[in-house]
């Protein structure tokens, strides 16, 4: 039997210009949200007390944070810190969300190697019982010289990586989201949708 995604949440990065988070959390709770997705800039620099205060604020508003975006620098450079952030905030799925333009490979082999690197980066998180994957933007769907796409190569290079599919970015990349979901649906563990 196939699983169906039925739990909806709010991606807090979308509200980053409307701080403080305490007000955002209250508004989301009043709107009926139960889950939010965090992002690196909101928690990567917090100390233990700051993380606990953030968790208390979420709890006070009836919100959980089952997923979070964590930058590649933190994931590679300080996986213990990333694990602690996830533990304190209750994050069950970590998604690496972006690769700066100057760091992006130029060919299929480079993207395959990046997928392999991501899978290795994710090992401590998977070993800790968390889901680990990649969150796409549009650049992963631009055709490479060999006819493949970066997204195909990332998933091939990291065969155990999960995928947080951002549907609007797939469309912005001139790709068909239905085709991608059909081909890789079993690896999709979360989805971003926008209007």
Residue ranges of each PLM-predicted region?
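Acidic/histidine-rich catalytic cores of soluble enzymes
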Residues: 35-36, 123-195
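Active-site beta-loop-alpha junctions enriched in small/polar residues
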Residues: 11-15, 39-43, 70-73, 99-101, ...
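Charged helix-capping and loop-helix junction motifs
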Residues: 23, 49-54, 79-82, 108-119, ...
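Surface-exposed, active-site-proximal loop segments in enzymatic domains
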Residues: 74-85, 98-112
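N-terminal pre-domain/capping segments
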Residues: 1-93, 162
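Active-site groove signature of glycoside hydrolases
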Residues: 91-108, 128-140
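Alpha-helical structural signal in soluble globular domains
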Residues: 27-31, 53, 57-61, 85-89, ...
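Short, charged N-terminal helix-start/capping segments
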Residues: 1-3, 94-104, 162-171
